[in-house]
Regions:
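Juxtamembrane boundary at the C-terminal end of a transmembrane helix
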Residues: 129-135
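Short, aromatic-rich membrane-interface segments at the entry and exit
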Residues: 25, 39-46, 67, 89-93, ...
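Juxtamembrane helix-boundary/capping and inter-helix hinge elements in multi-pass membrane proteins
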Residues: 4, 59, 84-85, 114
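Transmembrane helix-loop junctions in multipass membrane proteins, especially transporters and channels
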Residues: 56-64, 107, 111, 133
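Alpha-helical transmembrane segments in multi-pass membrane proteins
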Residues: 43, 47-51, 55, 59, ...
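N-terminal signal-anchor module of multipass membrane proteins
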Residues: 1-60, 132
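Short, non-helical or kinked segments that cap or interrupt transmembrane helices
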Residues: 61-76, 113-117
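Generic transmembrane alpha-helix signature in multi-pass membrane proteins
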Residues: 28-34, 76-83
Length: 135
């Protein structure tokens, strides 16, 4: 996979939050969130990139990968981590761990024919909130 396609797939992952598979929609979502909260938008983009890269490195389903499916839950985790934990080394660590965990949960559900939608995002954020008692 070239770096150009990795960035393209990352933007598709952002757009998949609203069930779109379009790099321009992903870019517009990024710009809109950036306008409101610059750090949250960067966390979102980084989380989506990391999840996409991880899915590629462990050779997950190529069609799902190319359509950005492995990135959208991580995009949501990125925004939630910044919202609940702020900007710190700790939150970056959570972002990395959460991005990888969403991919693993999503792949488990996919292989077992479960509809997952945003369940990986919900489970990861609930886990983080429960572990670190921020309610």
């Amino acid at each position: 996979m070239s770096s150009k396609s990795l960035y393209t797939i990352t933007l598709k992952g952002v757009s998949q939050v609203m069930l779109q598979e379009n790099i321009y929609t992903g870019l517009l979502f990024f710009i809109a969130i950036f306008y409101v909260n610059q750090i949250a938008s960067l966390y979102m983009l980084l989380a989506t990139f990391l999840a996409t890269y991880f899915a590629f490195k462990i050779s997950l389903d190529e069609n799902s990968l190319n359509s950005g499916i492995y990135g959208f839950n991580a995009a949501l985790v990125g925004v939630a981590v910044e919202l609940f934990f702020g900007v710190s080394f700790f939150s970056i660590t959570l972002l990395i761990f959460g991005s990888v965990l969403t991919v693993l949960i999503q792949e488990y559900f996919r292989k077992n024919s479960f509809s997952f939608f945003t369940l990986p995002f919900i489970l990861v954020v609930w886990l983080f909130l429960w572990l670190f008692s921020i309610f």
